[in-house]
Amino acid sequence: MDDLLDFNFYDKSTPSNQNNYSNNNSRTPSYSLPAPVAQKKNAQIPLKASKPEDPFANLFQKKTDNKISLKELERQKVGTPDSNSTPKSSNYDPFENLEILHQLSNTPRDKDAVIHDKIEENKRPISQPQVSASEKVTLKDLSLEPHQPVSLPAFENIGSETSIPFENHNEITNMNTAKDKLSSNEMYEKLRDLGFSDDQSRLALENSGSLEDAIEYILEKDNAKGQYREGEAYEAFSDSSAKTQFSDFQALSNQLKSQLFEKANDLWNIGRKKLRDAVEERRAVKDPSKPRWMDASHDFGREATPEILPKTPIPKRKPHKVPMNEKVSEDRITTNQSRSGNDESSLVDFLTSKSDNSSFNFPSDTYEGTENILETAYESTTARQVNNNKPGKSTVKKREEETLNNMVSALVEEQQSTGNELFRKGDFSQAIEEFTNSLSQLPAKHTKRVPLLSNRSLCYQKVGDLKTCLQDVDELVDIIGEEKGHGESIRDKSMNDYYVKNMVRKAQVLEQLEKYQESLNIWKDLIADGQISKLYIDGKHRCEAAISSHSSESHSKRTTQQPKSTPNHTNIKVKSERLQHVRMAQQKAEQLDEERSRLREPVQQIVNKWKEGKESNLRALLASLDTILWPECRWQKVSLSELVLPKKVKIAYMKAVSRVHPDKLPQQTSVEHQLIAESAFSILNHAWELFKQQNDL
């Protein structure tokens, strides 16, 4: 391979080629090379004398004739023709370009920069003065010279692949020199052309010596003015924001003031209304439609004040005795205090006070009654008898009874409260079960059995089980004892109240059973104990009338042979008619009780089937209410789609209650339908209470 590569050096025409090369070089601009490169170029390569002629010389000679030198390639790349160059011969020295490359590789400069310098030296004429690249290429702001457009290629790095033509360098140089020679008028015109004002241009030219300095001066001054304007704007904004905040605060304070005033006004109106209602309740408003005994209730049932009662003088020999009127007043005060704190302990108080106002229109603090006409109650403590034989509190013996466990006491109270709630809703059978469960937890003769027996006896009276009612009353009286509960209390309530209430109930039940003599004895005992009221007097008169009519009837039977023209025949006939009416009423009541007891279980099954699984779902109960009601009730069926809104549910509930309310049923309603209505009313009432809690009504 070495022989093949050295084909050009062993040719016989080598000296002539060297001469041609030297002649060609003489035409081009000369340039000096570094010393190492020149020495390498002048070095003689030894020839091999005994080298035979190469048979492939002509072949390679043709290829070398077609080669293009590196300099020509560079000229073609730049695209500028060389006017000084002449056509060179086909024979040239190949080491010329190699030496240039070797020189460039040994220099520390950048390769592109060296090539660029060589190209510029070849382009520049010999007579032209040497100008460095940094002097030729000076970037100016061409936007400042709009009237002299210059097509200058954009380049950042000198020596890049795109070289700068020689003509463009001359234009840049001429432009720079023209800028340096601009007059003040021309600079003024250029500043005006750039958009600056007259004052700005003149002031900038006075404080600067060139166009660039003038532009910088104007820009700096504008920046300073902008900062000053920003400061003024910030101060103005801060002042305006402070005023805005003050106005907002003032508006907010006015709004709060108006709201507080409105709320205070509303509260004042509410308080004034409540005060007016309280005063009206306290004030005894007289109604001209009421009879005299209702308005002057103090003549019949009010307490006697110490000023009205005659005072008994105190004997000197017994100074330790207390006057009778003071003793009565003290007992009355303590009794009223005990009653005021325990209105919720007994269920009977709630019912009697409510029904008494509706039937007799007595004041609520005068006496207590019941919801049923046949069912009356005693006047609690409003007209107590002044009894000197009544044992004082100091003489009452303390009861010795078993102490209950805390768990048992809690269970009994819970069951009692549940039974009271069921009674208020009208579910008497379930209330009886709860009271019975509570009584089973307590020992016999325990004082806590008294309120439970009292409530259960009332439930039995409601359902018509009069015999069981009498049994509970007798057990209660046996627990209270012969002292009749004077000086004793249960849960801060006088035990005598329970005694009197249940004795009144016993007298009513005996009167219903046509045991008028026993009922009369109870009424007389209550009156003898100081229970002087219209309620007890009426009971006594009824029993006396029934007894007298019964005796007169028997007497008339014995004297049937007497002439009809006797003067007392009319009175006897009237009394006998009254007695017949009373007996017929008693027979109807007994038949009604028997029928109620007979139909209770079948009706309960029907009601349980209706309410099963939906006791607390008022919508489902109303939607299926038609399954248990009778046609004469005139109930229109309601679907669940009509009971979506709580308002619609309330309307349907009010209609259902008006249909099944026990007091609003027609007189010809059968016993079975009455029982169904009572049970449905109780269940709907319970579901309505739950519905109100769930929907916040």
Curated annotation (Swiss-Prot):
The TPR repeat units are at 412-445
- Record's keyword terms, sorted: Chaperone, TPR repeat
Coiled-coil stretches: none
Question: Can you tell which superkingdom this protein's organism belongs to?
Answer: Eukaryota
Per the UniProt record, which residue ranges are transmembrane? none
Low complexity composition-biased segments: 13-32
Record-level GO BP terms: clathrin coat disassembly; clathrin-dependent endocytosis
Q: What is this protein's record name?
A: UBA domain-containing protein 7
